[in-house]
UniProtKB/Swiss-Prot annotation:
The gene is lolA. GO terms for biological process: lipoprotein localization to outer membrane; lipoprotein transport. Pfam families: LolA. Belongs to the LolA family. Monomer. Its main location: periplasm. SUPFAM superfamilies: Prokaryotic lipoproteins and lipoprotein localization factors (SSF89392). This is Outer-membrane lipoprotein carrier protein. Residues 1-23 form the signal peptide. Keywords: Chaperone, Periplasm, Protein transport, Signal, Transport.
Length: 214
């Protein structure tokens, strides 16, 4: 009996220690993100399948600003645009001539990447964060939803000191999208309009905002 109690105690202690470490990791990641009031960068993208076979490469421009502002413009190989203006998230596919719009709060459920500009305590509580050291200069944080609500099952974000340098997305099919950032800087005052989206003429609009359903 004493041996069983000892084993259970060790398991409980290990579990509590692991939970505390993950909480500390989440706190550290949020502290790093809170120091980024805005960021503008170019990115290169590489997508591989579950067998590490290349599927696609691409490039574009990425920007974010607190609170809840996000800009993602894929320019190669096919253009697409994602803009979060603080209240709404707009997804524009020029080829399909279609715009999807949803609440920013829904964006976090659609992809944990939205956590980069989201600082709500209740939202972060839905995710587990684990820190891992990649090298002497780089530190990565793995983010996983505690309950899967989207096709993105894992996100990792990597820093060199306080600079965000790359992030990866893994979907439920096992495809890995890797994004490397370069030319990082703050968003300039005269660039603030990149977080505003004007709906183009002659496009279909799929309005998924929650207020539309009420």
């Amino acid at each position: 009996m004493n041996k069983r109690i000892t084993v259970l105690s060790l398991l409980l202690a290990t579990s509590l220690s692991s939970a505390a470490a993950m909480a500390d990791d989440a706190t550290e990641l949020r502290a790093k993100l809170s120091n980024i009031d805005s960021l503008h960068a170019t990115f290169s993208q590489q997508v591989t399948d579950i067998n590490s076979k290349p599927i696609q490469t691409g490039s574009g421009v990425f920007a974010l600003a607190y609170p809840n502002q996000f800009y993602w413009h894929l320019t190669q190989p096919d253009e697409s645009l994602i803009v979060a203006d603080g209240a709404n998230l707009w997804i524009y596919n020029p080829f399909a001539e279609e715009v999807t719009v949803m609440d920013v709060a829904q964006a976090v459920d659609a992809s944990p990447m939205a956590l980069l500009v989201h600082r709500d305590e209740a939202t972060w509580a839905k995710y587990s964060v684990t820190k891992r050291a990649v090298s002497g200069k780089s530190t990565c944080f793995d983010i996983q939803p505690k309950k899967l609500n989207s096709n993105v099952v894992a996100v990792s974000v990597c820093f060199e000191a306080s600079q965000l340098v790359k992030f990866n997305l893994t979907d439920e099919q096992g495809n890995l999208s890797q994004f490397a950032l370069t030319q990082q800087r703050k968003v300039k005052d005269n660039e603030a309009n990149i977080f505003k989206f004007a709906v183009p003429d002659n496009v279909d609009i799929d309005d998924q905002r929650l207020k539309q359903a009420n």
